[in-house]
């Protein structure tokens, strides 16, 4: 053990709280949750070192954590956390103000009010109803499809928190159900998994489904979840797509002309954004040169609509 510690000390840098707080260093802990070894060190470090809530960029302005009015954003959605109830939980970070049970908030993307009757917090498998939450707290909100990753909730102000990017995928598979009678279940499952951010889902003009990922493991996880949670066995086939780019146009005329010429290479993502599916980098570069007025985006903010 002593030799291992000396090796670790020689291969790593001393911990710097200043560098940790500026985001340039990550502490590493060694322990075992099963054996209850080192757990206290992690918890103590969290209490002693974790930064206080910071101001966050909300597009129009910076939101300070000590502001009186409630605001925050959805950063994760998890479906089927309780297999018995097939529920969906939206994980929400409070950025300012205070959550109170039953409060009404303004759903910025939808442009309407919604009520949060019972927010949750989690400890392992246990769920506890929240009596209040302040800036920096994470709450779970039961979600029936009205909340997406990146959604902002406020007390009336039209803000949009940023900082949850979606990257253009590097691997692609065409997906279809082994059982034709379960095509709708496959579509529903992939729609929900796409909204979670578990995988990127693109739909072609004729309803064909294309999955995009940054690593092979994503396909395997999605296949397993479709089988376990949605009872759908799917086929994942190779495709001629090499890379993808989100599109934005300067005007409707350019959009119509581009769509007419490139119709076979277009699809939409779960938020309805138009995507160009290139067969190769050469194909992408050629199209970009031919259409200099069209913007080809390698990233987009979660829930962003171009």
State each model region's role.
Residues 1-306:
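Structural and coupling elements of P-loop NTPases
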């Amino acid at each position: 053990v002593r030799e291992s510690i000396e090796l670790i000390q020689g291969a790593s840098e001393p911990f710097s709280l200043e560098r940790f707080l500026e985001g340039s260093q990550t502490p590493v802990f060694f322990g075992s949750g099963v054996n209850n070894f080192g757990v206290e060190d992690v918890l103590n470090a969290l209490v002693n070192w974790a930064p206080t809530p910071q101001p966050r960029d909300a597009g129009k302005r910076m939101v300070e954590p000590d502001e009186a009015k409630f605001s925050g954003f959805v950063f994760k959605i998890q479906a089927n956390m309780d297999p018995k109830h097939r529920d969906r939980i939206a994980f929400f970070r409070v950025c300012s103000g205070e959550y109170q049970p039953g409060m009404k908030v303004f759903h910025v993307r939808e442009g309407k009010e919604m009520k949060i009757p019972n927010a949750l917090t989690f400890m392992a498998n246990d769920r506890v109803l929240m009596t209040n939450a302040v800036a920096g707290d994470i709450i779970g909100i039961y979600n029936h499809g009205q909340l997406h990753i990146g959604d902002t909730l406020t007390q009336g102000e039209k803000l949009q928190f940023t900082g949850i990017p979606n990257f253009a995928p590097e691997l692609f598979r065409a997906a279809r159900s082994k059982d034709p009678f379960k095509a709708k279940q496959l579509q529903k499952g992939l729609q929900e998994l796409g909204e979670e951010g578990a995988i990127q889902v693109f739909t072609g003009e004729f309803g064909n489904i294309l999955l995009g990922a940054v690593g092979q493991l994503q396909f395997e996880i999605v296949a397993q979840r479709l089988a376990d949670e949605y009872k759908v066995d799917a086929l994942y086939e190779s495709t001629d797509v090499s890379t993808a780019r989100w599109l934005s146009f300067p005007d409707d005329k350019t959009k119509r002309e581009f769509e007419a010429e490139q119709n076979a290479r277009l699809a939409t993502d779960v938020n309805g954004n138009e995507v160009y599916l290139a067969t190769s980098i050469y194909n992408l570069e050629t199209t970009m040169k031919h259409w200099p007025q069209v913007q080809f985006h390698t990233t987009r903010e979660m829930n962003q609509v171009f």
